[in-house]
Amino acid sequence: MIHNDTVADAKANPDLEQPYHELGLKDDEYARIKELLGRRPTDAELAMYSVMWSEHCSYKSSKTHLRYFGETTTEEMKSKMLAGIGENAGVIDIGDGHAVTFKVESHNHPSYVEPYQGAATGVGGIVRDIMAMGARPVAVMDQLRFGPADLPDTQRVLPGVVAGVGGYGNSLGLPNIGGETVFDATYAGNPLVNALCVGTLKTEDLKLAFASGKGNRVILFGSRTGLDGIGGVSVLASDTFEEGAERKLPAVQVGDPFAEKVLIECCLDLYRANVVVGIQDLGGAGLSCATAELASAGDGGMHINLDNVHLRAEGMTAAEILSSESQERMCAVVEPENVDAFMEICRKWDVLASDIGCVTDGEHLVIEHCGEIVVDASAHTMAEEGPVYERPYERPAEQDELNEPRGVELPETSQEVRQQILDLAASPALCSREFITEQYDRYVRGNTVAAKDADAGVLRIDEETGRGIAVSTDASGRYARLDPRTGAQLALAEAYRNVSVTGATPVAVSNCLNFGSPEDPGVMWQFREAVHGLADGCKEMGIPVTGGNVSFYNQTGDTAILPTPVIAVLGTIDDCARRIPQQLPKQAGAEAGADESQEQYHLVLVGAETREELGGSIWQQVVHDELAGLPPQVDLSVEQRLGAFITDQRDKIVAAHDLSEGGLSQAVVELAIQSGRGMAVNPMLSQHESAVAQGRTLAQQAAVGLFSETASRVLLAVRSEDYGDLMRDLAETGLTGGWIGLTGVSDAAGQPVIRFGSGVYPVLPFGGEIELDPAKQHDDDFDIVISLDEAETAWKSTLPALFSHAAGNNSVI
C-alpha cells in the first residue's frame, strides 16, 4: 500500500524532521519554503521545491548576471525574435513566413556516470525543447569535452558518449551537422556533453509554455513514468564529483529514441490540428517542472491527479512520480472540446495519453494522489521565487602570474618547423574527428548541404527556394582561462566567422555556459566576465542571445574545469546552391593524386593582419605543454566587415576556410587534405610587423606566421580571373588581405605536396596562368615540403589508434 505524506499530515505533524539537506536545500532555503507555505512541506512539496530551486532549474547563482543579456539587447536586436530567454528555446523570424528555433543544453554530470545514456538523453532532452516550440527538429550538433585522450577513464567515457549521441540522433532521423571535441586535463572526471538542436516552423505555428483558460485540461502524453532518473539532472547538476561520490548518485535517465521519434510526429499532428493551447516538455525535474512552469507562466492555477499518470513501476509515491525524469514525455494544455481530437491523434501514433487535471482559478498548484492532497502551493513560488544569490566574485590571485608574458622558444630550423606542423596536425587537439563523426548520420532527411569537415553545418529548409541555414558552435576554454571576457568574445567571433565563410548571414546566438563551483569567488569572476563579454559582443555585432543554459559545479573536488562558454551562432542563406564550400571542387576527368590535371587557384588570406599571438594557442599546448600569457586580441568590427565581405564576394570565392586553432598551418593542412590538392604558401606574407621581429631567423618568423592564432582571418581560394576584382573590392572594406599562395603543387613524381616557403611568390602581373616566380627562389630561403600522404596519415591516425579498441559504454555504478 502506498503511503504519502499529505497536506493534512504536514499540518498535524509540523515538527517532523525532513531530509532537505540530502535533497540539496540549505537551511535558509528550507526555512523560506516553510514561510511560504505557512507550515512544513509534504514530502512531495519538498521534492518539488528542491528540484525547482536547484541550480539546474532556478539559475539561482547565475540569474543576477544573466539579466545583463536583457539589459544589452536593443529593440532592433529583438525585431526578428519571436521567443527568447525564458522559453524552451529561442525562435527567430527569418522571413517569408519561416522561423527557426535553436538552443544548446548541457548533460555533463549524467554523462560521466553513465556515458551512453547520459549523452543519449541529453540529445533527447534538447530535441523535446525544440518540439515544445511548435517546430520540427531538423538537425543536432554536439560540443564534447574530455580528459586527456590517453587517459583510461577517457577511453571509457568518450566511446560511450559518442555512441549515445549517435545512437539517439541517428534513430530519430536527425542529421548531426557538426560540433567540437576537445581534450584537456581539467575535464578528466567531469566531461562536458553539450547538445544543440535546431528546428523549423511557420511563424504562425509557434507554441509557448503556459497554462491558460480556466477549465482547460492538462494532458500528459508519451512514455510511461518510471523510477529512472529520479533526481537525476536537477540534483546531479548541483553537486561536484568528489572521489567516491559517484556511488551515492541517483540513476541516470534511460532513453528510447524510437518512442521520441513517434512523439515528434504526434506533436506535429497535434499542432496541425490546432488542439494545443500550451505545451511543455518533461526534462530535468520531470512533472514537477512541467506543472509548476506551465501554471506559473499562465493566468491560473492547476489541479493535478497523479492517479491518472501511466506508470512503469508499481507502488510509486507522489514524490517519486513528480520527481521522475523518465524520458520522451510532454505535457499539454487543451481546451475541453478538443480533448477527444487530441486523444484520437495520440491513438493514431500509439502514444499513451492521459488527462491528469485542469487549469483552475488562482495561482495554486494542487496535486492529489490516492484520494489525498499531497501538494497545495503557489506554482509561482516554485518556478519564479527561488533564491537568487549575489555570490561574491573576485579575480583570482594567480591570474596575474598566469597572464605574465612568457618568452616563447620558437623553432630554430626549417626541419623543426616541419615537425611541429605534423605534431600539431597529429595532436588530439587538432587531429581529424572522422573517427567520431563517422558514427553520426550526417545526411538523413536529404537536406544536409555541408557537415563533414565543414566550418559550419549548412541545412536546406525550403526545397523550392533553396533557402537554408548555417549553424556553428565554438568555445575555447584555454582562451577563457587566460581572459574570460576576451575568451567569450573569441568564441563568438569564431562561431560568427564559421557561419560567414559559408556565405550565410549570422542572425542569432545561443549559449551553454560551463563553469566550476559558483561558491568559488574566482569561478564567479570568470562567469561574470564571460557573460559581460558575450553580451557586449552581441550588442556590438547586433545579433541577439535568444536563450541558453548554465552548467555549474563542473569540477572534480577542488579542481574546476577550464571556463567553457560554448557559443552557437545561427545564420541564414538565401540559396544553398550559392553557399561557399570549404574544399576545392573536384574537376571532372582529373586523375586522382595528379595536381597537374586539376585547375589551380590563388590562395588569399583576408581579415586581420597576423600578429605574434601565441598565448593559449594549440602550438603552446602541443609543443610546450603550457597555458600562459594573453589570448589573441579580438576586434568584432573587423569580424563583421569580414563576414559581410565574404557574403558579398561569394560568387568569386571557390572555397573558404577560417583560421582558428592551429593558425595558418592547420588551415592549409586541412584545406589540402580535404581537397586532395597540393599547395604552396608563403607564411611571411600578410604578417603584422610584430610577427617579423628583428634578429629572428626565417624559420622563427615562419613559425609565428604559421602558428599564431590571430582572430578574424579567413583563407580563400580564388580563380585567376576573379582575383583582381576581389582584391579591389577588399581594398574598399579597409580589411587587410593579400596573396599568400596557390594550389596545384606537386613533387617531381607528380604527387601533391604541401610546401611552406619564404620564396613562394606569384609570377607578376597576374595572367591566365597561375605559377610561382622562379626568380624569387633562393638557397637560403625557408622552405619545407610535406607530402599530402604524410600529412593525411598524421592527421587521421590519432583517434583510431587511441579509441578503436576502447570498451566504452561503461557506467561507474
UniProtKB/Swiss-Prot annotation:
GO terms for biological process: 'de novo' IMP biosynthetic process. Its main location: cytoplasm. Substrate binds at residues 106-109, 128, 253, 325-327, 551. Its EC number is 6.3.5.3. Pathway: Purine metabolism; IMP biosynthesis via de novo pathway; 5-amino-1-(5-phospho-D-ribosyl)imidazole from N(2)-formyl-N(1)-(5-phospho-D-ribosyl)glycinamide: step 1/2. Gene3D superfamilies: PurM-like C-terminal domain (3.90.650.10), PurM-like, N-terminal domain (3.30.1330.10). It is found in: Cytoplasm. GO terms for molecular function: ATP binding; magnesium ion binding; phosphoribosylformylglycinamidine synthase activity. ATP binds at residues 59, 103, 511, 548. The active site is at 56, 107 (proton acceptor). One of its GO terms (cellular component) is cytoplasm. Mg(2+) 2 binds at residues 129, 281. Keywords: ATP-binding, Cytoplasm, Ligase, Magnesium, Metal-binding, Nucleotide-binding, Purine biosynthesis. It catalyses: N(2)-formyl-N(1)-(5-phospho-beta-D-ribosyl)glycinamide + L-glutamine + ATP + H2O = 2-formamido-N(1)-(5-O-phospho-beta-D-ribosyl)acetamidine + L-glutamate + ADP + phosphate + H(+). The keyword Lyase does not apply. Mg(2+) 1 binds at residues 105, 549. InterPro entries: PRibForGlyAmidine_synth_PurL (IPR010074), PurL_linker (IPR041609), PurM-like_C_dom (IPR010918), PurM-like_C_sf (IPR036676), PurM-like_N (IPR016188), PurM-like_N_sf (IPR036921). Pfam families: AIRS, AIRS_C, FGAR-AT_linker. It is an enzyme of class 6 (ligase). Part of the phosphoribosylformylglycinamidine synthase complex involved in the purines biosynthetic pathway. Catalyzes the ATP-dependent conversion of formylglycinamide ribonucleotide (FGAR) and glutamine to yield formylglycinamidine ribonucleotide (FGAM) and glutamate. The FGAM synthase complex is composed of three subunits. PurQ produces an ammonia molecule by converting glutamine to glutamate. PurL transfers the ammonia molecule to FGAR to form FGAM in an ATP-dependent manner. Belongs to the FGAMS family. Monomer. Part of the FGAM synthase complex composed of 1 PurL, 1 PurQ and 2 PurS subunits. This is Phosphoribosylformylglycinamidine synthase subunit PurL.
